[in-house]
Amino acid sequence: MTTVPKNAVAKTLYQKVWDAHVVATPEGEAPIIYVDRHLVHEVTSPQAFSGLKVAGRKLRAPEKTFATMDHNTSTRSASLDALSPMARTQVETLAQNCKDFGVRLYDIHHPNQGIVHVMGPELGITFPGTVIVCGDSHTATHGAFGALAFGIGTSEVEHVLATQTLRQLKAKTMKIEVRGHVSDGVTAKDIVLAIIGKIGMDGGTGYVVEFCGEAIEALSMEGRMTVCNMAIEMGAKAGMVAPDQTTFDYLAGREFAPKGEDWAEAVAYWQAIKTDDGAVFDAVVELDAADIAPQLTWGTNPGQVVAIDGKVPNPLDEANPSTRASMEKALEYIGLSAGTPMTDISINKVFIGSCTNSRIEDLRSAAVHAKGRKVASGVTAIVVPGSGQVKAQAEAEGLDKIFIEAGFEWRLPGCSMCLAMNDDRLEAGDRCASTSNRNFEGRQGRGSRTHLVSPAMAAAAAVAGHFVDIRKPY
C-alpha cells in the first residue's frame, strides 16, 4: 500500500492504471483508453489484418505489436507438414500479415516462440502500469505484473492495430485477500482454484480483481501469473497483483524491459502505482491460506472444485435448484458419483502445460514427483513447455530426462491439449489430470473429461494412475 498525500483521493492499483490511460471520454460514450502492448496469434488475427487491408490502413504502432504462433501448432514437430490444412493456412497467413505490416513475429522456428502469455512476460514485453490486450481470454495472465491486461475480440484486434486505442467501460473493483501462508504441497494453482470455488465462476463478473495478502506476496512471478491467468474463470475482466521487488527482479535485464536510466525511472513509477492506503473496493473477498489444501475439480467448470481429501459433492445437499441441476448435469457428463473420494478417481491421460502452468517453476514441481518413478500402466502423460526458453532451461537442468525416463512424453512448445484445436486432444471417455484452466464439456476433445490440478498433482496422478494427496506418501 502507498500513503496518500493530504487532500488526495485514495485509489486502487486498477484505478491508477486506468486513469493514466484514458485518452478521451466522449459524452454519452465509453471512454477511449490507450493500449501499450498488443499481442497477437494465428487464430484471432487473420480477419483483423484483412480488415486493415480492405480499408487501406496501416498499423498505428507496429513496434508495440508482438506476434507468435501457439494455438494450432504441433508439439510433435516444427514442420508445417505436421499441421492440419486449416492450421497451416492460419500460421502462414499470420507470417504473411506480419511481413506486410512490419510486426515482430516469433514463428514456430524461432527459439523464443511459445504460448503468447508465457513468452510475453519472459521477454520483458509485459511490465507494470501498462495496458495489454490480446485476442485471447487468458490475457489476464499479464496482470501479475501490475498491468491491466484483458482479452479482446477480433473486431477489437483490428481497432487496436489501426488506432492503438480501445473503447472500454470502467469496471468495478474487487479485492481478494489471501491471508497467511499455505502449507507444503499447496501451490498457486490451488490458491486460485480455491478462490474460484469460493466465489463461483461468475463471482467476479463486472470486476477487475486485485489479488493481495501474504500468500500472494509470497508467490514467485510464475505463481502470480498462474493466479491472474484464471481471473477470467471467476468471470472477472482482469486480475492484477501490485508490483514489488519480486516483480522488479524478474524483469531486470529482459530484452524489452527498460534499461539504464529508464530502468530507474520506471521502477520509481511502478512503486507508486500500488493501491493507496484507504482506497475503497466495491467488493472484498477474504481467504485463510492455511485452510487451502491441494485442489481438484470434479465437474465441468473451474468453480466445481474440492480439496483432494474431500469427496465428490452430492447435488441433493444443494438448496438452490439451479445450482443443483448444474451439479447433476456435470456429474452425468464427467461420469462420477456423489460421495466418491477424490483419491479414488482413476485417470488415463495427463497434460502438464498451458498458459496456466507451463513455466520452468511448474516443470520443476512436476519433475519432483516424476523422478525415479514410472508412469502407471495404461496412462499417457505429456509435458509441454510453454516456450522455447522454458524448454531450453528445463533441458539444461535435466528435467526432460527425468520426465522421459519416467515415461512422460517431452514435447515442443505450444497450447497443446489445453483446447482441442491442434493434434493434441483427448478421445471420448478419456479422463485427464490437466494443469490447464478450463474443464468445460469437450474442451480437450469431444466427450473428454477434464480435472484441473497443479503440476505436482498431475505428475503424481500420472505415476499413481489415480489422484493422490501429494502431502502424504503414495
From Swiss-Prot:
<dbReference type="GO" id="GO:0046872">
    <property type="term" value="F:metal ion binding"/>
</dbReference>
<dbReference type="InterPro" id="IPR018136">
    <property type="entry name" value="Aconitase_4Fe-4S_BS"/>
</dbReference>
<keyword id="KW-0479">Metal-binding</keyword>
<keyword id="KW-0456">Lyase</keyword>
<dbReference type="InterPro" id="IPR033941">
    <property type="entry name" value="IPMI_cat"/>
</dbReference>
<dbReference type="InterPro" id="IPR036008">
    <property type="entry name" value="Aconitase_4Fe-4S_dom"/>
</dbReference>
<feature type="binding site">
    <location>
        <position position="418"/>
    </location>
    <ligand>
        <name>[4Fe-4S] cluster</name>
    </ligand>
</feature>
<keyword id="KW-0408">Iron</keyword>
<feature type="binding site">
    <location>
        <position position="355"/>
    </location>
    <ligand>
        <name>[4Fe-4S] cluster</name>
    </ligand>
</feature>
<dbReference type="InterPro" id="IPR001030">
    <property type="entry name" value="Acoase/IPM_deHydtase_lsu_aba"/>
</dbReference>
<comment type="pathway">
    <text>Amino-acid biosynthesis; L-leucine biosynthesis; L-leucine from 3-methyl-2-oxobutanoate: step 2/4.</text>
</comment>
<dbReference type="GO" id="GO:0051539">
    <property type="term" value="F:4 iron, 4 sulfur cluster binding"/>
</dbReference>
<comment type="subunit">
    <text>Heterodimer of LeuC and LeuD.</text>
</comment>
<keyword id="KW-0100">Branched-chain amino acid biosynthesis</keyword>
<dbReference type="InterPro" id="IPR015931">
    <property type="entry name" value="Acnase/IPM_dHydase_lsu_aba_1/3"/>
</dbReference>
<protein>
    <recommendedName>
        <fullName>3-isopropylmalate dehydratase large subunit</fullName>
        <ecNumber>4.2.1.33</ecNumber>
    </recommendedName>
</protein>
<dbReference type="InterPro" id="IPR004430">
    <property type="entry name" value="3-IsopropMal_deHydase_lsu"/>
</dbReference>
<keyword id="KW-0432">Leucine biosynthesis</keyword>
<comment type="similarity">
    <text>Belongs to the aconitase/IPM isomerase family. LeuC type 1 subfamily.</text>
</comment>
<feature type="binding site">
    <location>
        <position position="415"/>
    </location>
    <ligand>
        <name>[4Fe-4S] cluster</name>
    </ligand>
</feature>
<dbReference type="InterPro" id="IPR050067">
    <property type="entry name" value="IPM_dehydratase_rel_enz"/>
</dbReference>
<dbReference type="GO" id="GO:0003861">
    <property type="term" value="F:3-isopropylmalate dehydratase activity"/>
</dbReference>
<keyword id="KW-0028">Amino-acid biosynthesis</keyword>
<dbReference type="GO" id="GO:0009098">
    <property type="term" value="P:L-leucine biosynthetic process"/>
</dbReference>
<comment type="function">
    <text>Catalyzes the isomerization between 2-isopropylmalate and 3-isopropylmalate, via the formation of 2-isopropylmaleate.</text>
</comment>
<dbReference type="Pfam" id="PF00330">
    <property type="entry name" value="Aconitase"/>
</dbReference>
<keyword id="KW-0004">4Fe-4S</keyword>
<keyword id="KW-0411">Iron-sulfur</keyword>
